[in-house]
Every structure is written in structure tokens, then in C-alpha cells.
């Protein structure tokens, strides 16, 4: 916009618009919301942008010589509109009036009081319940990736070796906003690829190194702190930086998180997180997400988590009591941050008081071993100082209890006496003047006044000074009324100032307990997750898993699918084996694979699992190729994505990994597909992974591998068509039932019948060809063949087996 504003007219900008342009030019990357009375307004091109984004009516600001477009939103609805704008990708600069209009000498002074971006929010009304990460990425000695949640102060990062590992961590944390180092911003190919994968706001900041560790990571830390300080007006509440290693947790690549629908659904709305989220607090919800992002590798911490969940499973009354109390808690973690930033409102302190009142009850249920900090002193202070239902803003007044502050009480008494004067005045003047309808009133324009109706105008004393004439009444004032009124205004200003002083002292008292509040929030979040997992376990019949070398699941179920449909449980037993799962489409092979992985994942966050009995190894990674994450929009074919994900499996999977493969090789010719699937099966068998491989390639079921096991999903042809039993049974499937599934899908009858005829003919030809191949092999004397003749003979046999013309396989 520069120093110009889109509009019409020959004259200079009016003072209000000059002020708008000056503030707008300081924040060129932001949409400036400029307070004018009870509205936040935009002018010029920004008004057009705002109107388009929110569907507002575009009006015009008109002065003597200048007209410009104008659009605005009511201040009372700011939170709702701001949330929408942030989701649309706007950065918002909020310019408030910082002095009362009646006290301004000329134009009301305005200043930008808030800079709002998706990744730097602290306002409770605008924040999601989930973690709200700002991320920064830099390069150097690897990929430096750091995260900051400004609302909680969480500050962490890691150094990654590859771009794929970077993308995995970003997908795992799902930041709301990302800062890219200059070398990445200038790389157009990287930015284009990044935007396709992560539709989040990309922002800029100086990447000056800060902290300790590798350079790339220090640059990322510096960028986060610089950007956060800029948007927070220099104030920041950040915990010490925590370096974490993704390798210290179960490896869950992006493809696995997607295929297993851990956080985001492939279809519909159901996810694993949604199934598990019976938490009662926002910190508990965020902790459960963190556990799912980073499952544990070590048995000790897992058993400790399971012990706590089991206690809540066994003690139903305790579980219900704890969950009932937790439901009343405020978000203490974020409240502590607002205290440290000096942004906590009177209602925040009231929410803190209600939360602290719950802590003794929780201690009574759980005992002192729960380890909650002693915050009784702060609770007593808040109880003594704060009214039951304080206003949102300090400026609204009436938030400090009577009896808490002697100076404030004295001012209030003096003010009450002043108000009493006006109440007494009405009775006195009625008696003195003999005007029965006389009354004392007040409005913002004239202040206090005496009102007399028309029939009594003749009785109005001479000292009454008229201030307003209405249709059937007149309003007057007296010199002593104005003097008393001025004294009331003075007392109101003093009361307001003193209340603010008392509130700030109270907030400072609470701020000193911010770390204790964070510790309480951490303990309560863990309790919340344990109780939530126990609630899920009891409600849906989960069992405590055991850890060992073999994988044994009895009557296992898919935790998400069973919520929406009747579910057939299945058993599985394996140990460092390759398990081939065959059967028709729609029979449940993919569901069986996914439920096995989800049971393993649940066990390694410390949850009970959906099964009658479960013994599981401690997996170091869960790898999938289930066809859910094809990148067609990114220009990659299904087959290319499939091969990339398989390549990752072969690169990373170990004998302690769980590998799920579904129909690998189907994106190319059947010959290529069989060859690739066979080679992959052999490689994973050799690596001793725990592998579940669903396939239509029946050739794989006959592989001569010592640790290969065949399972199939049962189906049967009956008079009404194909029936799926969804039972997983030993041995390979007898046929694929492809034509029958096509008929169930609604293909026209003539197409289905033609397919059956073709299938019969091809099967007959193939059987005849195989017989001919066998006959020719039996008649062959290999000792009498030259090498060239042997090669030609093999080509002919292959052509016969495939039903191709002889000679077509040469060259």
C-alpha cells in the first residue's frame, strides 16, 4: 500500500486515514484491523480483501475531498472473525484506541497492540486444544528442525539426516506455521514441493544462531525466538530448549501414520486418536497426542504406564471421581504462560482459583503420593481478592472483593455517599418544589439531571438550569449537582486505577507460581491420560498386553472399525516370520493388517489393547505400504509411490520391525509385479522382520522359505453370491473371486458374464499351455543343446506359459 490509499478525490488523506496508513506501513505483511469506536475497520484494498474473505458488505469512508472503500467487523465478535481469517492464511495486526475518545486532544491515539499469526497465538479463544507449533527449518550439518509452542513455552528440536526424515517429523507435529531459512526460501523446487505436502503458512525471520549444538539446529532456534519476540512485542515465556532424538522412539514414518489413520482419516472422520481421546483436560489431550507421535522402545517405562492405567481399570469409582474433577480444570499449562507474559485476564485468575480448589479433592482421592505442588497460599489469596464472577477486562471494574484492600474500600464508600446524594436529592426536591413527578436521571451526554413533566413547568424553581427539552418534559441541573458529579467522576477514576493496581499485584503473585502451575499441569495431564485410556479399556473390552519375543494376539480387533460396524475378531501368532495373507478384495485383508499394527502401537504407548489376550515384541519401527498415500497430485504414479515406500522399508526395517505390505506390485504388469513381490518377500524373510504381506499373487504362497506362513481370509460362494466371513484362517486362499466381487460392486450382468467366459477360456488355455510346457521339458535332452539353443528353448517355454505366439519373447 505504501503511503497511498486506494480511493477517489483530489484532496489529501483525512487525519484518521493518515493514521491508518502510518500504522499499515509498519506491518506490510499483516492485515491491519483498525479500531474505530465499536468496530475494527479496514480501508482501501485491505477493505476489499476483508470483505471478500468474510463475505462482508463493502461500504465507503467519505470525507470532504476523499472517498475510499471500507469494511469492518464488530469488536464484540472479534474472536470468531479472527479465527476465520487466521485459518484463511492472514496475519493480523490489531490497532486499538489507547486513550478514551473524550480525553483525546484531537485524533484518538491508536497503537498496534497485537500481532496474530497461526503459529504464535496465546489467546485462549483463538487456540486449538492441540499443541500449536511454530516450526523453523535450516540446513547446514543436516536438517535443523525446531518447534516452539508460544502458548505453553514448549521449545524443542532435532537434527535430521534426510529430507524424508524431516517430512516425517513435520507430519508428526503438524505445525501451524513454518519459518524457512533463506537458502530454502530461495529454492523454488523445495518451496513448491513443501507447499504441496504441508498447506501451512510460510513466514520469514532472521536465522541468527542461538543456543548450543549443531549449526543448523542453532539457526532454527534463533529464528523461532526472533519471530516469536517480534509477534509478542518482545515478551516471551519459553522453557529451556530440549534436544530430542526421533531414534529414541518407535519409528513411525509418514506413510504409516497416514495408512493407520492415527491423526487424520483417509475416509470419513474416524481416527485412532479420536477413538482414544477420552481426556478431560486440554493438557491431557496434548499429552496423548505426544504419546502417539512418539511410542516408547523400553519395557520399563511402558510397564510403569500400564500399571497406572490398570489401577484406574480396576478401581472404577476412583476413575470416575478423578475424571469428574479433571473435567472442571482450566488449561493450567497455557494459563501459566499468560501469567508469565502478563496477559492473564480477571477471568483467567477466576479459572485458576476454580482449578486450585480441585487440587485438595484430587489429593484426597489419590493420596499425597500424587505429588501435586502446594498452591494453597495462592488459592487463599485469590479467594480473598477476586469476586465470584469477574469481568473479562480490568477496565470494566468490579473485580476486587470488598474487604480485601482498605484503600479501595475507602474510595468505594466515598463513591457510594456521592451516589446517595443524588438519591436523596430527588426526595428533597420533590418536597421543596411540590412537583410529584420530579425525578433524578442520568445519561452519558448530560450527566445527572432533574426531570420535570409539562404540567409542572410553572413550579420549576428559578435556580434550575435547563439542559434538554423533550416533547412532554424538560431536564435541568443545579450548580451543586455538577460539583457532586465531578467528584463522582474523580472517585470512579481513582477506583478504576486502584482496582487495576490491586489486580496487577494479584497477577504478579500468581505469576511467581507459574512453574509450580506447570508442574501441576504436567502431573494432572498424565493422570488424565491414564484415566482416559482406562475408560476406553473398560468401555470397549481391552486387555493389558504382555511383552515377549513372539507376537500372539487372541481375538484381536481393529479399534476404529469396531466402533462403526459389527466386527469379527481374529487370532495371529508369528515370530520373525513372513506371513502371506490371501483372499478376495473386500474380505478384510487390509483391516487385519492395520489392526495388528494398531494393537502394537497401542501397546507401545502404554495402553490396553483391543483383544482377549496379547503378547507382543517391542518393535523398533512400524512400516506400512497399504496404498493410502499415493501422490497423484504431486505428479507421482501409484507405482512410484509404492516403490518409494517399499524402498524405505528395505532401507530401515530390522528384525525388530513390524512390516505391513498390501498388494505390492499391482501398479505394473503382472509379470513385473510378481517378480517385485517375490524379491521383496525374500528380502524381508532374510531380514527376519515381522512381516504381514497381503497379496493377490498366489505364486508367492508356494515360495520355499522356511519362515513363511500362509493365512487367508475366508469367503464362500453361495446361492445369493459371495459371502465374506472376515475370518483369518490357516493356509492360502483357493481363488481370488475377482469376478464375483465385480458382480457385487454392480457391474452390468453382460460384462460379468463376459468376464466369466474369458476367465474360463484363459484358464483352459493356461492349463493346456502348462501341459505342453511339461511335455516338452520331459522330451528334452539338455546334454544335446547348445547354449544358444537352450536360450531359445527357454524363450519358447515362457511364451507358451503366457499364451503368447512363439518367437514373441526373443530379444
Curated annotation (Swiss-Prot):
Nuclease among keywords: no
Presence of the UniProt keyword DNA-binding in the record: yes
SUPFAM superfamilies reported in the protein's UniProt record: DNA repair protein MutS, domain I, DNA repair protein MutS, domain II, DNA repair protein MutS, domain III, P-loop containing nucleoside triphosphate hydrolases
SMART domains per the UniProt record, alphabetical: MUTSac, MUTSd
Cited InterPro entries: DNA_mismatch_repair_MutS (IPR005748), DNA_mismatch_repair_MutS-lik_N (IPR007695), DNA_mismatch_repair_MutS/MSH (IPR017261), DNA_mismatch_repair_MutS_C (IPR000432), DNA_mismatch_repair_MutS_clamp (IPR007861), DNA_mismatch_repair_MutS_core (IPR007696), DNA_mismatch_repair_MutS_N (IPR016151), DNA_mismatch_repair_MutS_sf (IPR036187)
GO molecular function: ATP binding; ATP-dependent DNA damage sensor activity; damaged DNA binding; mismatched DNA binding
Binding site for ATP: 583-590
Keywords annotated in UniProt: ATP-binding, DNA damage, DNA repair, DNA-binding, Nucleotide-binding
GO biological process, one term: mismatch repair
Similarity comment text for this entry: Belongs to the DNA mismatch repair MutS family.
Described purpose of this protein according to its UniProt entry: This protein is involved in the repair of mismatches in DNA. It is possible that it carries out the mismatch recognition step. This protein has a weak ATPase activity.
Protein name per Swiss-Prot or TrEMBL: DNA mismatch repair protein MutS
Species, as recorded: Thermus thermophilus (strain ATCC BAA-163 / DSM 7039 / HB27)
Amino acid at each position: 500500500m505504501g503511503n497511498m490509499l486506494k480511493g477517489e478525490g483530489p484532496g489529501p488523506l483525512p487525519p484518521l486515514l493518515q493514521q491508518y496508513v502510518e500504522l499499515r506501513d509498519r506491518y506490510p505483511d499483516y492485515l491491519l484491523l483498525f479500531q474505530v469506536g465499536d468496530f475494527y475497520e479496514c480501508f482501501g484494498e485491505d477493505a476489499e480483501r476483508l470483505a471478500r474473505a468474510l463475505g462482508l458488505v463493502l461500504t465507503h469512508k467519505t470525507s470532504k475531498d476523499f472517498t475510499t472503500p471500507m469494511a469492518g467487523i464488530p469488536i464484540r465478535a472479534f474472536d470468531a472473525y479472527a479465527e476465520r481469517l487466521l485459518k484463511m492464511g492472514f496475519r493480523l495486526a490489531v490497532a486499538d484506541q489507547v486513550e478514551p475518545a473524550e480525553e483525546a486532544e484531537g485524533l484518538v491515539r491508536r497503537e498496534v497492540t497485537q500481532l496474530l499469526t497461526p503459529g504464535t497465538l496465546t489467546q485462549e479463544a483463538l487456540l486449538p486444544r492441540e499443541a500449536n507449533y511454530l516450526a523453523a527449518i535450516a540446513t547446514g550439518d543436516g536438517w535443523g528442525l525446531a518447534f516452539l509452542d508460544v502458548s505453553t513455552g514448549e521449545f524443542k528440536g532435532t537434527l535430521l539426516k534426510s529430507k524424508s526424515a524431516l517430512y516425517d517429523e513435520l507430519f508428526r507435529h503438524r505445525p501451524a506455521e513454518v519459518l524457512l531459512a533463506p537458502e530454502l526460501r530461495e529454492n523454488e523446487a523445495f518451496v513448491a514441493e513443501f507447499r504441496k505436502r504441508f498447506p501451512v503458512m510460510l513466514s520469514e525471520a532472521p536465522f541468527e544462531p542461538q543456543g548450543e549444538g549443531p549449526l543448523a539446529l542453532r539457526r532454527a532456534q534463533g529464528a523461532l525466538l526472533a519471530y516469536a519476540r517480534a509477534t509478542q512485542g518482545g515478551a516471551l515465556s519459553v522453557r529451556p530448549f530440549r534436544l530430542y532424538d526421533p531414534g529414541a522412539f518407535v519409528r513411525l514414518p509418514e506413510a504409516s501414520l497416514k495408512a493407520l489413520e492415527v491423526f487424520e482419516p483417509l475416509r470419513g472422520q474416524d481416527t485412532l486418536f479420536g477413538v482414544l481421546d477420552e481426556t478431560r483436560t486440554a493438557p491431557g489431550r496434548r499429552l496423548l497426542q505426544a504419546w502417539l507421535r512418539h511410542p516408547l522402545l523400553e519395557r520399563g517405562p511402558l510397564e510403569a504406564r500400564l500399571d497406572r492405567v490398570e489401577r484406574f481399570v480396576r478401581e472404577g469409582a476412583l476413575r470416575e471421581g478423578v475424571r469428574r474433577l479433571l473435567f472442571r480444570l482450566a488449561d493450567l499449562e497455557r494459563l501459566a504462560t499468560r501469567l508469565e507474559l502478563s496477559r492473564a485476564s480477571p477471568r483467567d485468575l477466576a479459572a485458576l482459583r476454580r482449578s486450585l480448589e480441585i487440587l485438595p479433592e484430587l489429593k484426597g482421592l489419590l493420596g499425597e503420593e500424587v505429588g501435586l505442588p502446594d498452591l494453597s497460599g495462592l488459592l487463599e489469596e485469590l479467594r480473598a481478592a477476586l469476586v465470584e464472577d469477574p469481568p473479562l477486562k480490568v477496565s470494566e471494574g468490579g473485580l476486587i472483593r470488598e474487604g480485601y484492600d482498605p484503600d479501595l474500600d475507602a474510595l468505594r464508600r466515598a463513591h457510594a455517599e456521592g451516589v446517595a446524594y443524588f438519591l436523596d436529592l430527588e426526595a428533597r426536591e420533590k418536597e421543596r418544589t411540590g412537583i410529584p413527578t420530579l425525578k433524578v436521571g442520568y445519561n452519558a451526554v448530560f450527566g445527572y439531571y432533574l426531570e420535570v413533566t409539562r404540567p409542572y413547568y410553572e413550579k420549576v424553581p428559578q435556580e434550575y438550569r435547563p439542559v434538554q427539552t423533550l416533547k412532554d418534559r424538560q431536564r435541568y441541573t443545579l450548580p451543586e449537582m455538577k460539583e457532586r458529579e465531578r467528584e463522582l467522576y474523580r472517585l470512579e477514576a481513582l477506583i478504576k486505577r486502584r482496582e487495576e493496581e490491586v489486580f496487577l499485584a494479584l497477577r504478579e503473585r500468581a505469576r511467581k507460581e507459574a512453574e509450580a502451575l506447570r508442574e501441576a499441569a504436567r502431573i494432572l495431564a498424565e493422570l488424565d491420560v491414564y484415566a482416559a485410556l482406562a475408560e476406553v479399556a473398560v468401555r470397549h473390552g481391552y486387555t493389558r498386553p504382555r511383552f515377549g519375543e513372539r507376537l500372539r494376539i487372541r481375538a484381536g480387533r481393529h479399534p476404529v472399525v469396531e466402533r462403526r460396524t459389527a466386527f469379527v475378531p481374529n487370532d495371529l501368532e508369528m515370530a520373525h516370520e513372513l506371513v502371506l495373507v490371501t483372499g478376495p478384495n473386500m474380505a478384510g485383508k487390509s483391516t487385519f493388517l492395520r489392526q495388528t499394527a494398531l494393537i502394537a502401537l497401542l501397546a507401545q504407548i502404554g495402553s490396553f489393547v483391543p483383544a482377549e489376550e496379547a503378547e507382543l515384541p517391542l518393535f523398533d519401527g512400524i512400516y506400512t505400504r497399504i496404498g493410502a498415500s499415493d501422490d497423484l497430485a504431486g505428479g507421482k504414479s501409484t507405482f512410484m509411490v509404492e516403490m518409494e515406500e517399499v524402498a524405505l522399508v528395505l532401507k530401515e526395517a530390522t528384525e525388530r520391525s513390524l512390516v505391513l505390505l498390501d498388494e505390492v506390485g499391482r501398479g505394473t504388469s503382472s509379470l513385473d509385479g510378481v517378480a517385485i513381490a517375490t524379491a521383496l518377500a525374500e528380502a524381508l524373510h532374510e531380514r527376519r522382520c515381522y512381516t504381514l504381506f497381503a497379496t493377490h499373487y498366489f505364486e508367492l504362497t508356494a515360495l520355499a522359505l522356511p519362515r513363511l506362513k500362509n493365512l487367508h481370509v475366508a469367503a464362500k460362494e453361495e446361492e445369493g453370491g459371495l459371502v465374506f466371513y472376515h475370518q483369518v484362517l490357516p493356509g492360502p486362499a483357493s481363488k481370488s473371486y475377482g469376478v464375483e466381487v465385480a458382480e457385487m460392486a454392480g457391474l452390468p450382468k453382460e460384462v460379468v458374464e463376459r468376464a466369466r467366459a474369458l476367465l474360463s477360456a484363459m484358464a483352459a488355455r493356461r492349463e493346456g499351455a502348462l501341459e505342453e510346457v511339461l511335455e516338452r521339458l520331459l522330451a528334452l535332452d539338455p546334454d544335446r543343446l547348445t547354449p544358444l539353443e537352450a536360450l531359445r528353448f527357454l524363450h519358447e517355454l515362457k511364451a507358451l506359459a503366457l499364451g503368447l505366439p512363439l518367437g514373441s519373447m526373443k530379444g
